[in-house]
Design a protein with these regions (language model features):
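Short, structurally constrained coil/turn elements
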Residues: 14, 19-21, 57-58
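N-terminal secretory signal peptides that target proteins for export/translocation
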Residues: 1-2
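Beta-strand/beta-sandwich contexts
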Residues: 20-50, 100-119
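Bacterial N-terminal signal peptides
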Residues: 5-15
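Intrinsically disordered, low-complexity boundary segments flanking structured domains
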Residues: 11, 92-93, 119
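Immunoglobulin-like IPT/TIG beta-sandwich domains and homologous Ig-like subdomains
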Residues: 37-38, 42-96
Length: 120
């Protein structure tokens, strides 16, 4: 490859990497769970398709559910809440190759999570 061609290829590769947007999380639903339970939840937002992991202060484990088909706007995850977890609010963030999202709150408590049914 000629030096000029190599330079152009390098600049284009860097430009495409720099233009990748970090993940944006608008919502987490459900946003909480009871101690000692497993909660399937979904992050909603933008640029979530390349999610690598979920990090934060949550005391249990959080895994990306590949079986539920993640997309650019929806990231299904599974929270495993330890039985001895302290009740309270914990920050969680989505990590992609382009960056880290702003935090969302996941609440751990003693009461069951009750999903609303329509109509009210």
């Amino acid at each position: 490859m000629r030096p000029a061609s190599a330079l152009v290829a390098t600049v284009l590769a860097l430009a495409s990497a720099a233009s990748a947007a970090p993940p944006v999380v608008h919502e987490l639903f459900p946003a909480g769970g009871r101690r000692g339970t497993t909660v399937d939840a979904v992050f909603g937002g933008a640029d979530l398709g390349g999610a690598v992991t979920v990090v934060g202060t949550f005391p249990g484990t959080v895994g990306i559910r590949r079986d539920a088909k993640p997309s650019a706007s929806s990231l299904p995850v599974r929270f495993v809440v330890p039985p001895d977890a302290r009740s309270g609010e914990y920050e969680v963030r989505v990590v992609t190759a382009a960056g880290v999202s702003a935090p969302r709150i996941f609440v751990v408590g003693d009461l069951p999570e009750v999903l609303e049914t329509e109509p009210n």
